[in-house]
Amino acid sequence: NLVTGSPAADGVTALFALDATVTLQGPSHERSVPVTSFYSGYRTTVRRPDELVVRVSFELPKPGAAQTWRKVGTRKAQSISKAALAAVAETEEGVITRVGFGAASVAEVVLPLASVRSLVLGKNVHSLNMNDVEEAVDSEIRPIDDVRSTGRYRRHLMKVLVKRFLQALA
């Protein structure tokens, strides 16, 4: 799932939310790449033909961190997502101190929703402006129409999934 570069890679969303690092090894070298930089385009990665993925690493969230993984599909199992979101957040006294997102099936690659992260990091969960959150999601995703869903519905889903996660922090 990680190396195929699929924009619908549900499991990869968690790696994005956790800010994972992918370690690649070739015949005479080893290098590490943030998972958010691992994908170079639709179904393409920065992995060279002579490299293997040998490790995926990430820092575990602190105990009590909020975490979610949501997949919306036509069926309950074995369905390619209309949209999927993984999110992790740590708070201290209501202030978001760490947050990460991974969004699938809303662009040509899995997205970290960096604009949403920048918007909410360091903010009090009770003072988040959900209209601003929606605008940040809207500005970053690029969903398409295909046999599974419309781009319009995917856009709506991602806004709802992100807002529900952030509202649950309060």
For the regions a protein language model found, what residue spans apply to each?
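C-terminal structural segment of proteins
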Residues: 1-170
